[in-house]
Design a protein with these regions (language model features):
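Exposed beta-strand face motif in extracellular beta-rich ectodomains
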Residues: 167-169
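Mature catalytic domains of secreted/periplasmic carbohydrate-active enzymes
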Residues: 1-140, 145-163, 172-184
Length: 190
């Protein structure tokens, strides 16, 4: 929990992973009349980014029909969701990484248009980051704040409101508990 929530607590501490449960449909069970109401791939992708990219696991219910099979509408949206997630992952921008004290810098070989930043703590070391500021820069210009995050954990996907073109992305951890361990930091092409 937050430092404020823990201030007056003297018992043992435990970390529990967050979990997001939803269904491909508006309910948990299959009804033939709902085959045209399966959630869209864009809605499911948004839920995936918000859950997996929000330090949680994503449990997606796909209800079988009365024959024990998945409806074609569900299978189609799952295939398209898989393609969309694969596309997101394939847009990782190659960069060199420099770690120094509380700052991680990604340097690109040329200006790149960035649509998201992914931060991942080494959970084996604990969830420690309370706040981080993400800035971008094109060589020869000043730093520009593009995002501020509270809590990173397993994975934080920071989708930028507006893509930025940069030669460098910098993540500055401004508050943490006993240091921090960023297992991975990368930018995703817009």
């Amino acid at each position: 929990g937050s430092r404020e929530a823990l201030a007056d607590y003297s018992g043992p501490l435990a970390w529990y992973p967050a979990e997001v449960n939803t269904s491909t449909r508006k309910g948990w069970f299959h009804h033939d009349v709902e085959d045209s109401q399966v959630r869209s791939v864009d809605e499911l992708f948004s839920i995936w980014k918000g859950s997996v990219g929000g330090n949680a696991t994503f449990l997606l219910n796909v209800p079988p029909n009365r024959d024990g099979l998945l409806a074609d509408a569900d299978v189609e949206v799952l295939a398209r969701l898989g393609e969309k997630i694969a596309d997101f992952r394939s847009r990782r921008i190659e960069a060199s990484r420099e770690d120094e004290a509380n700052v991680v810098t990604l340097r690109f070989d040329a200006p790149r248009t960035v649509g998201a930043i992914v931060l991942e703590e080494d959970i084996a070391q604990g969830q420690r980051i309370d706040e981080a500021v993400v800035t971008s820069c094109v060589e020869g210009t000043g730093e520009q704040e593009i995002a501020r995050v509270h809590c990173v954990g397993y994975r934080r996907i920071v989708t930028l409101e507006k893509p930025v073109t940069a030669t460098r992305i910098r993540v500055t951890v401004t508050a943490s508990r006993q240091g921090f361990y960023l297992a991975d930091v990368y930018a995703v092409r817009a």
